Structures are given as C-alpha cells and as structure tokens.
C-alpha cells in the first residue's frame, strides 16, 4: 500500500512539473512571437536571453532571437543562435540561409560557401548562388620613399583574382612586380602567388599557399619560394588561425610559425581587431614579431584601419605569405594606416600609408622608409 501511495505521489509531481514546463513554454513562445511580429527587436533579444538563462530553450526561440540580432546587424550574436540550432538540426534551412548571410557579411566567404552547399536547390536558384563564381578582381600599386642616397625609391604592383571553384573550395591568385634601386644596381622581382582554402566543415578551413619570386641583383638570379600550410577555426565572434611558412629566400632558409586572432568586437565589421604572433627562424636566430590591427567604420561604406608591427621582420611573410619582405635590409619597426571606401556596392577603393624603420644588412646604418599604396577591387 505504501509503495502505491509513493508511486502515485511521484506521478503527480511529474505531471505537475510537465504541466508547468508546458505552460512556461507556451508563455515564452507566445510572448517571443508577439515581439517578433511587432518588430520589437531589442526587447525580443533581451526577453529571449532571459528565457534561455531560465532553461526555456527551443529552436523557434533561438531563430527569433537570431533574426532580431540579424536585423540589428549584430551578425556575431545572430550566428551564435543559428549555430546552436544547426548543432541539433544541421538541415534547418532558415538557420542555414541566415548563417550563410552572416558569414558573408563578416567577409568569411569560405564559411558562407560551405553553408550554401547545404541549402535547398530552390533557395540556391532563387538567390542565384553559384558553386563556381568569380568573386573579385583588382590591382594595387605603390611607391616607397627613403631618406638616404644608397637606397632609391622602390615600387610595387600587383594584379589579383579571387574565385570560388566549388562551394567548399576557394582560390586566390596574383602576379606582382617589385623593384628597388640599391646604390648603382637594382633588385627586380616578379612574383606569382596562389592560395587554396578548403572548408570541409562548418567552422574549420584548411589553407595552402605557394609564392614564387624571381629576384635579380648584380647579374645574379635567385629562385625564391615560400610554402604555407594552415588551419582556421571560425568561432561565433572570433577567428583563430595557426599556420606554418617555410621559405627559401636567396641563400637563406626561413621557418615561420604564426598564430592569428580576429575579433569582431561590435558583432560586425564596424569595429574589429586582428592580432598576429609570429616566430621567425632565420640565420640561426629566432625573431618574435607581433602585429596588431584595429579597424573601424566611422561612416557608411568607409573603413579606417591602424596597424603596427614590432620585431625583426627580416624575410617575414605576411597575409598568408602573400607579402614576403625580401628586401635588401631588415625592418625593425612598421606602422601604418589603411582607408577603404566602397563605391556603389561593387567597387572598393583602397589607400594606405606605411612608415618603416630599417637597418642596412651589411654596414648596419639605419634609415626611414615611407610608403604610399593605392588599390582598386571589383566585387562580382
């Protein structure tokens, strides 16, 4: 008899608990839907977070919170919710589509491509999403000024093309030319660069790059090359990338180990930072190089960046080995500013200034170098 009474009491407790949970769910669902329909985005975000903290967690609530953040252009918070939905239902088309847009608006083209590969065909056709797509073409050119006779003004030019070969595979390729007067001679250096980005998972990408440079100095020809291999993890509000670069520059072998952090501080590209730590092993020395960049969007379609690089940058590879500092001298300090203006959605104009403190590689005298660079990119 006692066992029956105990079992009955337990069943009553379970039924009451379930009833309260259902009532709580119905209330949360009703209020969040009303806020959603009324376009009360900030109130919806606040209410939804409180509901989640109280254990009231269901896909529709997260989708509503995510969309409220998306409308407010907080793509990081929106992605946080969409990724939670996809963790439990990887085929949810609403979460896939808006997560695709969030990644695209954060310039994560490789992650956006992965998500596009899982969209229904009617969505792909309606949005005109293509697995093979030419994404960008452009060019940049600049000049470097020095304050000493022994080093003339050098020039740099580059033309590039970016494309998506498949939803999960991206290619960047470019041709560059660098020229630097050295006393009574010149360093002339054409270069070819290619980078593949493969994204087999929603958050993880593998990176491979190759850079070839042919340098001519005093009738000597050097076949220089650099190879990069890396992995990148795309978090909700930040990216982490680790990579390794091995290069043969002239007669010198260089090994470089990088760790890069990208933080979307404002939840979008209105305020962001990029921190990069590098260990460069060259000439039997280990040089630590640290680079810090902050970017801000002060007005519509305009971005400003400030960047500083500390450490001995001899044979230093930057931007996934796109830029190899194969100069005659060592760079000890570098700081600069970049400006980008988006004109009519497709045309991006860029202008940058760089200040460098350099040291002669043989006689050890110091000098300053100033650089001005301009670029143009057409986005398809």
Predicted regions and their residues:
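Generic helix N-cap/helix-start motif at coil->alpha-helix transitions
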Residues: 22-28, 56-62, 91-96, 152-153, ...
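Outer-membrane beta-barrel translocator/channel fold
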Residues: 176-191, 209-227, 242-259, 264-367, ...
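Outer-membrane beta-barrel strand-turn architecture
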Residues: 106, 163-169, 198-204, 233-237, ...
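Alpha-helical protein-protein interaction scaffolds
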Residues: 22-131
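Transmembrane beta-strand segments of Gram-negative outer membrane beta-barrel proteins
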Residues: 127-145, 164-173, 206
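Surface-exposed strand-loop-strand hairpins of Gram-negative outer-membrane beta-barrel proteins
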Residues: 143-160, 173-183
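Bacterial Sec-dependent N-terminal signal peptides
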Residues: 1-26
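Short, charged beta->alpha transition segments
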Residues: 81, 125, 193-197, 226-232
């Amino acid at each position: 008899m006692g066992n029956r009474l105990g079992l009955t009491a337990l069943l009553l407790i379970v039924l009451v608990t379930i009833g309260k949970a259902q009532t709580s769910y119905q209330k949360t669902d009703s209020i969040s839907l009303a806020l959603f329909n009324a376009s009360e985005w900030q109130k919806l975000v606040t209410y939804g977070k409180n509901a989640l903290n109280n254990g009231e967690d269901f896909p529709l609530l997260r989708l509503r919170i995510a969309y409220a953040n998306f409308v407010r252009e907080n793509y990081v918070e929106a992605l946080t919710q969409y990724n939670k939905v996809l963790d439990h239902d990887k085929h949810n088309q609403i979460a896939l589509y808006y997560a695709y847009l969030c990644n695209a608006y954060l310039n994560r083209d490789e992650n956006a491509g992965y998500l596009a590969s899982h969209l229904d065909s009617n969505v792909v056709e309606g949005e005109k999403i293509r697995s093979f797509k030419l994404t960008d073409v452009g060019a940049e050119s600049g000049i470097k000024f020095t304050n000493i006779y022994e080093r003339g003004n050098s020039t740099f030019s580059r033309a590039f093309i970016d494309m998506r070969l498949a939803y999960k595979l991206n290619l960047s390729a470019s041709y560059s030319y660098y020229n630097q007067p050295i006393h009574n001679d010149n360093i002339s250096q054409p270069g070819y660069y290619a980078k593949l980005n493969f994204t087999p998972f929603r958050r993880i990408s593998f990176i491979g790059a190759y850079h070839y440079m042919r340098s001519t100095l005093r009738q000597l020809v050097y076949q220089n090359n650099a190879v990069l291999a890396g992995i990148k993890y795309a978090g909700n509000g930040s990216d982490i990338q680790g990579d390794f670069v091995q290069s043969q520059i002239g007669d010198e072998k260089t090994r470089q180990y990088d760790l890069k952090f990208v933080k979307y501080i404002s939840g979008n590209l209105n305020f962001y930072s990029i921190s990069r730590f590098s260990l460069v092993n060259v000439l039997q020395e280990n040089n630590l190089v640290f680079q810090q960049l902050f970017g801000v969007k002060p007005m519509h379609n305009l971005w400003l960046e400030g960047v500083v690089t500390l450490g001995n940058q001899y044979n230093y590879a930057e931007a996934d080995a796109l830029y190899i500092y194969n100069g005659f001298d060592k760079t000890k300090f570098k700081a600069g500013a970049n400006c980008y203006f988006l004109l009519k959605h497709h045309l991006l104009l860029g202008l940058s200034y760089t200040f460098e403190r350099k040291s002669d590689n043989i006689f050890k005298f110091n000098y300053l170098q100033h650089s001005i660079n301009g670029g143009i990119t057409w986005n398809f």
